[in-house]
């Protein structure tokens, strides 16, 4: 997390993507900045300051998930979204609540790995190009009994690398000169479409037993990988594609994964964000039959994770003491007070998000960075078509979205995507074959395409 991003700056960045909901934006910005404040305190006091977890209540499609997702991107924090209804009480078949922490660690590992790949890419590319040169211009193989026995022992121990075979070769002056020539051509990009055959490590098969062990924090693939020799397969690829594969291989050799995993765990513990959606669906306010899994039991399983506990993962133990939890739900048939009291107390910040108005829809269509209209304009630009929306057309689209939400299920801003897809289906279908340089979407066109559907309520429910 960076010093520069104050709560006000975080809100300004969120404003680029999310319309309205200022109270929610302020709350998440303050909760996030409090992490930075905590890290400035003495170590002893840091342990006593817990994150101010948040409970968002509001109808679907008003920006609950988007606020949390954008927040994580802004501060480059590990982020996972889970649905409370997917978890089952301990003792039942299904996902256990600790899996959300394991998913978060996996995301942190992926982020750390990407950063390390970027750091070593130059060095890995150089090594990959050297390997390509040797593949294009192979040396003269020299086999002897001692080397064969040594390779067999390495294969049995799982340490044999097929690329080691290149070391057991004789390089004459002619081969050396040809390799210099090929290296020069590679650097100039003259051999990108030439095909080469490379040996790559075979992806391990998915093992259901291994997945179960992973849920218990045991990495079976790593344990078995140390005992069994690594299998390789031959693939014929273009030089440009082969280089990418080899860069990945060489990058992994240059990275200290033990150190990477430790950083990923620390990143998870200090910066991780877990978004628990549909938490209202596991409250006592939702009717349940005697045959259903106890939803209150799921709440009690979630409680120690949110409260602060240690979860075993295949990368090591992870403390959840300072992970930020954001829970969200529509609470249409229940209320936050229907949660068990202990869990309520772990979400001290309560934010209510407002239903979107017609004016909000107009802003959502136009204002955000990469808004829906900007996305469709960019898509059709690929066909050489300039797509233009008049202000009257935008107002009419917003009005239709608002009215359909009022008359049927209110799905918030998601209604706009459905309406635009129906409105532009002919243009998107015929676009590649049209020679028109510009298409203007007017209010009249919007009414022509959508009026019949809006009048017929049954069609509205089915299509929009």
From Swiss-Prot:
The keyword ATP-binding applies. Its main location: cytoplasm. GO terms for cellular component: HslUV protease complex. ATPase subunit of a proteasome-like degradation complex; this subunit has chaperone activity. The binding of ATP and its subsequent hydrolysis by HslU are essential for unfolding of protein substrates subsequently hydrolyzed by HslV. HslU recognizes the N-terminal part of its protein substrates and unfolds these before they are guided to HslV for hydrolysis. This is ATP-dependent protease ATPase subunit HslU. A double ring-shaped homohexamer of HslV is capped on each side by a ring-shaped HslU homohexamer. The assembly of the HslU/HslV complex is dependent on binding of ATP. It is found in: Cytoplasm. The keyword Cytoplasm applies. Keywords: ATP-binding, Chaperone, Cytoplasm, Nucleotide-binding. Belongs to the ClpX chaperone family. HslU subfamily. NCBIfam families: hslU, PRK05201.1. InterPro entries: AAA+_ATPase, ATP-dep_Clp_protease_ClpX, ATPase_AAA_core, Clp_ATPase_C, HslU, P-loop_NTPase. One of its GO terms (molecular function) is peptidase activity. GO terms for biological process: protein unfolding; proteolysis involved in protein catabolic process. ATP binds at residues 19, 61-66, 277, 342, 414.
């Amino acid at each position: 997390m960076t010093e520069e991003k104050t709560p006000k700056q975080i809100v300004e960045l969120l404003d680029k993507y999310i319309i309205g909901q200022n109270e929610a934006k302020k709350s998440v910005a303050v909760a996030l900045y409090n992490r930075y404040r905590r890290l400035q305190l003495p170590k002893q006091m840091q342990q006593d300051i817990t994150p101010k977890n948040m409970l968002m209540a509001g109808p679907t499609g008003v920006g609950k998930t988007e606020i949390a997702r954008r927040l994580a991107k802004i501060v480059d924090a590990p982020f996972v979204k889970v649905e409370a209804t997917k978890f089952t009480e301990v003792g039942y078949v299904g996902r256990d609540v600790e899996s959300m922490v394991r998913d978060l660690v996996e995301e942190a590992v992926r982020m750390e790995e990407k950063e390390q790949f970027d750091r070593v890419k130059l060095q890995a590319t150089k090594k990959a190009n050297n390997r390509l040169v040797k593949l294009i211009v192979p040396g003269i193989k020299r086999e002897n009994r001692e080397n064969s026995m040594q390779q067999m022992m390495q294969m049995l121990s799982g340490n044999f690398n097929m690329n080691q075979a290149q070391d057991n070769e004789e390089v004459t002056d002619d081969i050396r000169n040809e390799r210099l020539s090929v290296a020069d051509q590679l650097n100039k990009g003259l051999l990108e479409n030439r095909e080469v055959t490379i040996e790559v490590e075979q992806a391990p098969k998915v093992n259901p037993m291994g997945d179960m062990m992973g849920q218990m924090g045991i990495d079976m693939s790593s344990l078995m990988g140390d005992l069994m020799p690594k299998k390789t397969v031959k693939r014929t690829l273009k030089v440009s594609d082969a280089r990418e594969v080899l860069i990945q291989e060489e990058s992994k050799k240059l990275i200290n994964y033990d150190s990477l995993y430790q950083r990923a765990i620390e990143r998870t513990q200090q910066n991780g964000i877990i978004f628990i959606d549909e938490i209202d669906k596991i409250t006592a306010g939702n009717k349940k039959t005697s045959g259903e899994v106890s939803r209150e039991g799921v709440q009690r399983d979630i409680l120690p994770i949110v409260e602060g506990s240690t979860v075993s993962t295949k990368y090591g133990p992870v403390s959840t003491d300072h992970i930020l939890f954001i829970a969200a739900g529509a609470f249409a048939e229940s209320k936050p007070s229907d949660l068990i009291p202990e869990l309520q107390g772990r979400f001290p910040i309560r934010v209510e998000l407002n239903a979107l108005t017609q004016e909000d829809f107009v802003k959502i269509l136009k204002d955000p960075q990469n808004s829906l209209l900007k996305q469709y304009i960019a898509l059709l630009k690929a066909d050489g078509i300039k797509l233009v929306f008049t202000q009257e057309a935008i107002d009419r689209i917003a009005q239709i979205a608002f009215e359909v939400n009022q008359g049927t299920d209110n799905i918030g801003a998601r209604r706009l995507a459905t309406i635009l897809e129906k409105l532009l289906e002919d243009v998107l279908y015929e676009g590649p074959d049209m020679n028109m340089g510009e298409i203007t979407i007017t209010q009249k066109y919007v009414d022509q395409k959508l009026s019949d559907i809006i009048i017929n309520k049954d069609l509205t429910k089915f299509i929009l």
